Amino acid sequence: MIDSAKRIGRKFLIILISFCIVSPNLLAWSTFDSNRNALQGKVICIDPGHGGTAETDSYRVGPTGEREEWINLRVAILLGEMLKLAGAEVILTRTTDTFIPLADRSKIALENKADLFVSIHHNATADPKVNFPIVYFHGSAEENRASVDFGEMVAQKLVKHLFKGKGPYSLVSDYTIFSSSGASVLRGTYGIPGIIGEATFFTSPKEEKKLRIPDYNNKEASAYYEAIISFFESSEVSKISEKEDPSRVVPFEVFQEADRMKPEAKMWKSNFLKGKKLLKKGGEARLVEAFDLLTLSARSFPDSYVAKECHELRLEILRRQGKTEAVEMEEKRIRFFTPDPNRWNHCNLIW
C-alpha cells in the first residue's frame, strides 16, 4: 500500500513539473535568465516540511485527505527548479515523501554552506474560515534582522500571488509558538538567513481544493522565488548577531499543534474583540476580564494577525495597573517577537 502510494506520488510529481513548465503562469524563461546575476553562486537550501508520516500523524491533513507534507514537497520541487534555472545551487532536504529528522535538515543546510534556508510548510487550525500567510524567523527581530527582512519579503509576495495582494499576514518569531527554544530547523541553522513559511491553511476546505492544483502550487513557488530574488538584490543585507534577547523574556505558554484544533481555539478572534471592547469601557473589573480574554486569544492562536495587538492591549492594561516588571517584560516580548513591517525602512515589496 505504501509502495503503491509512493509510485503514484512520483508519477504525480513528474506530471506536476511537466505541467508547470508549459503553464502560461510560470515565470518566463527570460525572467530566470535575467535573475542569474542575483543568484549565481548562491546556495539555497529548501526544506519541504514533515514527510513520511501519513500512517502516524492525523493532525496534518485537510478536510478531504490532502496532507501537508505532500503539498510542501510539490511546492519545494517547483521552487527548486525555478532557482536552478536562474543559476542557483539548490539543496533539498528531501525529494520524496520520507521522514527526515529535524537535526538532519539543519545539518544539510550547514554542511552545504547554504546562503539561505527556506522551510516550506502549510498551516492548520480549528477554524475552517481562517486562511492567511504566516512567516517565522528565529529568535529576536533585533538580533536576526536578515531573516526578518527576508520574512517580510516572503510574506508580502505570498499575499500578492495567493491573495490578490490583499489581506493580513503575520511575521513573527518562532518563539511565539515554541516559547522556550523556537523551531528546531531555524535554531539549528541560526546564522544563515532563514524562515519557515506557512503560505496558507489546508484546513480551509476551499484552500485545500486549490492546493491540489499544480498551477496553484506554482503560484506559491513563484512567490518564494520572487522573494528570494528581492533578498539577494537588496543593496544592503542586514546582520545576524549572537542570540541573547530570547533568554531575557519569560516564556508565554501557548496552545500546541493538536490543542489548536480544539473547539475553544475557534474563539481566538471573538475573545480578542470582546477583550478590546471591554478595555475601551474601562473599570477595574472589566480590565481584568479584558486581560484574560486577550491572553486566551494570544495563547490559542499565538501567531494570528491579531496576536500582536492582543499583546499590545495587554501591555496597556498592565500599565494602567502599575505592574512595572510585567510591563517591561511585555514590551520586550512585543519588540523581540512581533516586529513592525518595514521597521528598518525597507520599501513595500508587494508590487
How would you name each of these model-derived features?
Residues 2-351:
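Catalytic-site microenvironment of enzymes
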